[in-house]
């Protein structure tokens, strides 16, 4: 899988751009605020139909324009496929092979992308919602129906929280509607949790040996899922649903008192351990970086296992931040298999042999040469 070419219209600081890429390594060089990260972001949006940098889609549109458009042509399973994302103040539309997709969840997965940027260290050391979002985005790539159930879950969760706020103000009100919304919430929560458990087992399978290799066999990585209910990871959705039913019955009064939902996938977390110690709390910066890198490299192999083709890798201002050993391990892992985009302010710190193999692009004020 690789991107043959990309066209941008009214996107961020790009008025109009058409660019063809090498199917192996592409290095994008530019000073800060010139547009190199915007170019990487556009590839990400082409995959996920959303930005990793902002939830406000109007920021993707040039300030004096009323729309932005990202068009890409990808090679997937030996076929050349055109993709398009159009963004307006009213929302987004996605096309595959010139056919508009009725739901964005039908589009996600059309092209698979793994991004590694400095902020990805927050997967290890940041807040729980960052790790939940990581799981949701990666699962959505390999299981498009996951996105549907996630959207339905979030919709019902919002309705349920609104009702709990009302019941908080009027605690003696009828709770029949709460039971209806609880059943709907459990239906989607059970599917999400079951699929997260399956995904986590695959992530462990790939991340643990990668981490051992990067750490020169000195460290053992463990990944633990921390749910809001007591449930084993081998439980199916029916068993998970039954446990949720008992949990919500148990916390019903407390939820009404607090006016919010106290259980569900939206309250879960991932915990990373290295040699038995929580990396978030006790890990060195080097261990945190190794853990983040191991997870990203594991994603590449996991997508290949599930989809049958390697994803596209985006290394946004991160390669020069890795020491020589970690950089070598990363490049040796992906060499010849993965189309890679590297953005950097300077080629210093990037392996000479990598630059020799790469197509170089220089970005200045939204113009690529």
UniProtKB/Swiss-Prot annotation:
Keyword check for ATP-binding: yes
Binding-site list for ATP: 30-37
Classification via Pfam families: SMC_N
InterPro entries assigned: DNA-binding_RecF (IPR001238), DNA-binding_RecF_CS (IPR018078), P-loop_NTPase (IPR027417), RecF/RecN/SMC_N (IPR003395), RecF_2 (IPR042174)
Main location: cytoplasm
Domain of life: Bacteria
SUPFAM superfamilies according to UniProt: P-loop containing nucleoside triphosphate hydrolases
Record key words, sorted: ATP-binding, Cytoplasm, DNA damage, DNA repair, DNA replication, DNA-binding, Nucleotide-binding, SOS response
Compartments in which it is found: Cytoplasm
One annotated Gene Ontology cellular component of this protein: cytoplasm
GO biological process: DNA replication; DNA synthesis involved in DNA repair; double-strand break repair; SOS response
GO molecular function, one term: ATP binding
TM segment ranges: none
PANTHER family: DNA REPLICATION AND REPAIR PROTEIN RECF
UniProt similarity note: Belongs to the RecF family.
NCBIfam families, alphabetized: recf
Function: The RecF protein is involved in DNA metabolism; it is required for DNA replication and normal SOS inducibility. RecF binds preferentially to single-stranded, linear DNA. It also seems to bind ATP.
Full protein name: DNA replication and repair protein RecF
Organism of origin: Oceanobacillus iheyensis (strain DSM 14371 / CIP 107618 / JCM 11309 / KCTC 3954 / HTE831)
